[in-house]
Amino acid sequence: ILSMLLFGAGGIIALYISGTDVTIPAHYHGSTVGITIGLMCFIYMIFIEYFNMEQSKGMKWQLITYTIGQAIHITGLAWSGGYGALRKNHGEILSVKLKISMGFMGAGGLIAIISGLTFIIIVLKCFYKINKFK
């Protein structure tokens, strides 16, 4: 469900693209992250179904925090695009509204990065458990 929500958000944001602002990355981040979440769930399902591991609270919370982080990230990008923030325009003087929306985007990105690293740690622990019992 989380995967479909973000994929759908990416599709809806695509309807609002009207130039070369940061609405474009908001669209493709929504679409690709939706697929990424689906693949994360698939990896967890493999560990649970084929290697008889229990679903940990960490798995559940990692998916939730990754989704929330990316949703904030995408919202910040779309919000900034609504104010006309251009892509790849370094050194531009930003208004306070743009700084706030880009800060929102950055905060969501940071949450998603930390959660993505958590995914790697969880997967490595699962591989360790598999090799430990062989």
Predicted features along the sequence, with ranges:
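Hydrophobic alpha-helical transmembrane segments of multi-pass integral membrane proteins
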Residues: 1-134
